Regions:
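Active-site neighborhood of phospho(di)ester-bond hydrolases with catalytic His/Asp-centered motifs
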Residues: 78-79, 193
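Glycine-centered loop/turn positions within well-structured domains
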Residues: 84, 92, 130
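Flexible gly/pro-rich beta->alpha loop and the following alpha-helix that scaffold active-site loops
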Residues: 18-77, 90-91, 95
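Glycine-rich nucleophile elbow surrounding the catalytic serine of serine-hydrolase chemistry
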Residues: 79-88
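Amide-donor transfer/coupling interface in amidating biosynthetic enzymes
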Residues: 6-9, 27, 34, 56-72, ...
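Active-site metal-binding loops of divalent metal-dependent hydrolases
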Residues: 37-38, 83, 195
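Short loop/helix-cap segments at secondary-structure boundaries that form the rim of catalytic
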Residues: 14-17, 26, 86-87, 135-137
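Short, charged N-terminal beta->alpha structural module
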Residues: 1-21
């Protein structure tokens, strides 16, 4: 049984996790879930606010303080905003505005070379206008598992999103599933999409459950 603590509101964000129990205290959890919602404050990743960005300083402060309570033997999971928060708290920045990712349905994501044990393609629901940008981090601080099957956005806007960074997005791909494992921080499983909008037995969630269980096992070893 996986013990899950959901930060703030929205226990439905954990609906895709198999064989779980929602717990009321973070210290009892195997997994700490950071949910979706509004954008995060760009100050969290050292950038100026783009005109399209809207955030709740109160929520940001609460979730950052909660993140600081997570132990090394616990795993963080974030969906959409939650993944972006994890990205920022591990030292990376965000693209503050993109197109064609608020699709109201699913789109395909593709496995990144080197992760052959994972299926080549998965489908994820997508409802976001911002995007993780982990590519400036040291390679040992993260694993890029999936990117958009095709680069969907027509533009990438935001402070510090230079032509060089745009070129990396077009070359490597638009990040969809990233595991952050910076030394000194808890492991953070970030999913840009919304697996909670799929049934728990959907093929995508079968894969995500395997990933999550592997991370939990590794932290308990």
């Amino acid at each position: 049984m996986i013990k899950v603590f959901v930060v703030g509101y929205g226990t439905g964000y954990a609906s895709w996790i198999h064989d779980k129990k929602i717990v009321e205290n973070i210290e009892d959890a195997d997994v700490v879930v950071f949910t979706g919602g509004c954008d995060i404050n760009p100050k969290l990743y050292g950038c100026a606010q783009h005109e399209s960005t809207s955030f709740s300083r109160q929520r940001d402060d609460f979730e950052v303080q909660t993140y600081k309570q997570v132990r090394p033997d616990q795993v963080c999971y974030g969906a959409c905003r939650g993944a972006q928060l994890g990205c920022a708290l591990n030292g990376a920045i965000l693209v503050q505005d993109v197109s064609n990712h608020w699709c109201g349905g699913t789109h395909d994501i593709s496995r990144v070379f080197g992760e052959e044990e994972l299926p080549e393609e998965l489908a994820v629901p997508s409802l976001h206008h911002q995007m993780m940008y982990p590519y400036d981090l040291p390679k040992e601080d993260y694993d890029l598992l999936y990117v958009s099957k095709h680069n969907r956005s027509q533009y990438y806007h935001g402070d510090k999103i230079t032509d060089e960074k745009v070129a990396k997005l077009r070359e490597i791909g638009e990040p969809e599933v990233v595991i952050f494992h910076k030394d000194g921080n808890p492991v953070f499983f970030g999913v840009q999409g919304h697996p909670e909008m799929l049934s728990p037995d959907h093929p995508t969630n079968i894969v995500f459950n395997k990933i999550l269980r592997k991370l939990i096992h590794e932290q308990h070893d």
